[in-house]
A protein has these predicted regions:
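Structured functional modules or segments
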Residues: 591-666
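Catalytic P-loop NTP-binding/switch module of NTPases
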Residues: 551, 557-602
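Catalytic cores of soluble metabolic enzymes centered on carboxylation/carboxyl-transfer
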Residues: 259, 298-530, 658, 664
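Conserved nucleotide-binding/hydrolysis modules and their immediate coupling elements
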Residues: 307, 515-519, 525-542, 546-553, ...
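Short flexible coil/turn linkers enriched for glycine and charged/polar residues
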Residues: 149-153, 162-164, 193-194, 205-207, ...
């Protein structure tokens, strides 16, 4: 067994590999860029080597720099994680030439499966079901349009060396094919150093289901069930689960056997994932094979009990698999929510900055339930614009799907993140969505259920009453505290009344509070009463309460007349006033926000890649105005309506912040 391995990656996956290596008694080496000098993976590793500036193409994906770090530290093997160099055959070749083990598949398998065109041909030869499309190389946008017309819209434009949702676009017409080809080509070049593009038919309303395979390259190949990955945004997975609520035993076995056949056809050795799209009739089609550890591997580990990182290390060290197909369990149900640094209320645009508060829920592994949080960040750390915006992977396990979802709800409620935008409200909303709960979902779930983007959740009346009762009880505690530090003489404090009006989601709830040493009873106008118990104190960002014996966890920010309350995807202003104050407030005119209707604002921190218009140009609704790159993704900003460009304030190469004015219109 290896004595020392280097992890050629960063963030949560580097931390994940370090944990298993430590368990196996193997020393670890981290690599880091300038931006990651204080990163968690650097702190966790036994050694760390600096490899360059923040951009990945000047540090993490520069093979020579990684090889220098290997030589400097004497590492015997390298785990590539996912992304970066994990599926780069030249890296595997460089390691082989150096006599260093690659904790992954052979170079030939990476090469064959890393090229989407070649992999599809191999899959067809191995009798794996495939999607129709054009597998040749495409030279320019006009050829892409012609091929798209021949295949028939809609089509998927994909980077041959792509993955992780990058270098992929769906096109429904010639214009989208033309623009999608160029954006995919640019993203592919910057993310993978390979700008080859291919086009295939886009299967509408599919599910995305993948099979985890494991092979030792010595005649033993097994599959470890499937993962359902249909909850996606821009082809980037958001929520995964294992097993799938859709598959039956016959389809599961057929997909597993075809996946193993494909692995054997390319001489595979290590952990790998074969991705399929599955239609409503359970017909499945090969999508791609990822020759690396997947981001979502924890859900497989939770239902099988197999440590996939350990298996990868053992196979790389020449060991045979210690488990056979008959040993593979499917125990219970696991969920994974990807926590991203992005603002769901602003079209999921990337968010960067410092984590002023980072308190994940406690990790649990006990009979009947489990909570796991794979992360690479810490409180006080920075979320950088240079890398993927994932903060953490929050996983739960329970005996069945409904229980696993409930565990996830509670875990998301308990997760505290401040300082940056994050998608916890959206994840919480999905967990409560009827379609998700029923398992009735496709890869179009997010765009169909949130066609105008995520605007928060509208809570029902019983939930609003629970939050109103809790808010009133917390406000009473805050008011009592304020009277005690008012500067008045003892025994002359301002009296805290019992009657309040709580305004939530546009509704007013007149309530009366009767307090006792153990809590408070909030009585509504109609006579209904709710008992609230909590040890919450003013200033605490999370309130863990009991309302009529049922738990309620709220994220709270104190204000002058109440709280900002966040709960299960709802972001509410809870204003709490005396009846007289509420009466007067109702007569006050609303303050209108500034008019930005004639401006194009930068929706995220990022870099202007190109500006498509000039001053004085008349633009049409939907016309591309400029492209902003952030978190390795290109975002085309379009005109919301017809108009004339009056002034352009930014040029290609400019770095902008959120709400910077890019251009103004007449």
């Amino acid at each position: 067994m290896f004595k020392k391995i280097l992890i050629a990656n960063r963030g949560e996956i580097a931390c994940r590999v370090i944990k298993t290596a430590r368990k196996m008694g193997i020393q670890t080496v981290a690599i880091y860029s300038d931006a990651d000098a204080n990163a968690l993976h650097v702190k966790m590793a036994d050694e760390a080597v600096h490899i360059g500036p923040p951009p990945a193409n000047q540090s993490y994906i520069v093979i020579d720099k990684v090889m220098d770090a290997i030589r400097e530290t004497g590492a015997e093997a390298v785990h590539p994680g996912y992304g970066f160099l994990s599926e780069n055959p030249k890296f595997a070749e460089a390691l082989e030439a150096e006599g260093v083990a690659f904790i992954g598949p052979p170079k030939g398998a990476i090469e064959a499966m890393g090229d989407k065109i070649t992999s599809k041909k191999i899959a067809q030869d191995a009798d794996v079901s495939t999607v129709p499309g054009y597998m040749g190389l495409i030279e320019d946008a006009e050829e892409a349009v012609k091929i798209s017309q021949e295949v028939g819209y809609p089509v998927m434009i994909k980077a041959s060396a792509g993955g992780g949702g990058k270098g992929m676009r769906i096109a429904w017409n010639d214009n989208e094919a033309r623009e999608g080809f160029q954006s995919s080509k640019n993203e592919a070049a910057s993310s993978f150093g390979d700008d080859r593009i291919f086009i295939e038919k886009f299967v509408t309303q599919p599910r995305h289901i993948e099979i985890q395979v494991l092979s030792d390259g010595q005649g033993n190949t097994i599959y470890l069930n499937e993962r359902e990955c249909s909850i996606q945004r821009r082809n980037q997975k958001v929520i995964e689960e294992a097993p799938s609520p859709f598959l039956d035993e016959e389809t599961r076995r057929a997909m597993g056997e075809q996946s193993c056949a494909l692995a054997d056809a390319v001489g595979y050795a290590s952990a790998g994932t074969v991705e399929f799209i599955v239609d409503g009739d359970k017909n499945f089609y090969f999508l791609e094979m990822n020759t690396r550890l997947q981001v979502e591997h924890p859900v497989t580990e939770l239902i099988t009990g197999v440590d996939l990182v350990e298996q990868m290390i053992r196979v790389a060290a020449g060991e045979k698999l210690s488990i056979q197909q008959s040993d593979v369990q499917r125990n219970g149900w696991a969920m994974e929510s990807r926590l991203y640094a992005e603002d769901p209320y602003r079209g999921f645009l990337p968010s960067i900055g410092r984590l002023t508060r980072y308190r994940p829920p406690a990790e649990i592994a006990e009979t009947g339930r489990a909570v796991r949080n794979d992360t690479g960040v810490f409180e006080g750390g920075e979320i950088s614009m240079y890398y993927d915006p994932m903060i953490a992977k929050l996983c739960t396990w329970a005996p069945d799907r409904a229980a696993a979802i409930e565990e996830m709800r509670v875990a998301l409620d308990s997760f505290e993140i401040e300082g940056i935008g994050h998608n916890i409200p959206f994840l919480a909303a999905v967990m409560d969505h009827p379609k998700f709960i029923s398992g009735d979902m496709t890869t179009a779930f997010i765009e169909e259920e949130y066609p105008e983007g995520f605007e928060g959740v509208t809570l029902d009346e019983p939930t609003l009453r629970r939050i109103a009762a809790a808010s009133a009880a917390m406000h009473r505690v805050a008011e009592i505290r304020r009277t005690r530090i008012s500067g008045r003489m003892s025994h002359h404090e301002r009296h805290v009344g019992s009657d309040w009006v709580v305004k939530l989601q546009g509704q007013s709830f007149p309530v009366s509070i009767a307090a006792d040493p153990d809590g408070a009873t909030t009585t509504f106008e109609d006579g209904a009463a709710l008992r609230v118990e909590s040890d919450w104190m003013p200033g605490q960002p999370m309130a863990v309460l009991s309302v009529d014996g049922a738990p309620l966890i709220l994220k709270v920010d104190s204000g002058t007349s109440g709280f900002r309350v966040r709960y299960r995807g709802a972001d509410l202003e809870a204003t709490i006033r005396t009846p007289r104050q509420a009466e007067l407030a109702a007569r006050m005119p609303e303050k209108l926000p500034p008019d930005t209707s004639k401006m194009l604002l930068c929706p995220m921190p990022g870099l202007i890649v190109k500006v498509d218009v000039v001053e004085g140009e008349e633009v049409q609704e939907g016309q591309a105005l400029c492209t902003v790159e952030a978190m390795k993704m290109e975002n085309i900003l379009r005109a919301e309506k017809k108009g004339v460009v009056a002034k352009i304030n930014a040029a290609a190469g400019d770095s902008l912040q959120v709400d910077d004015v890019i251009m103004e219109f007449e």
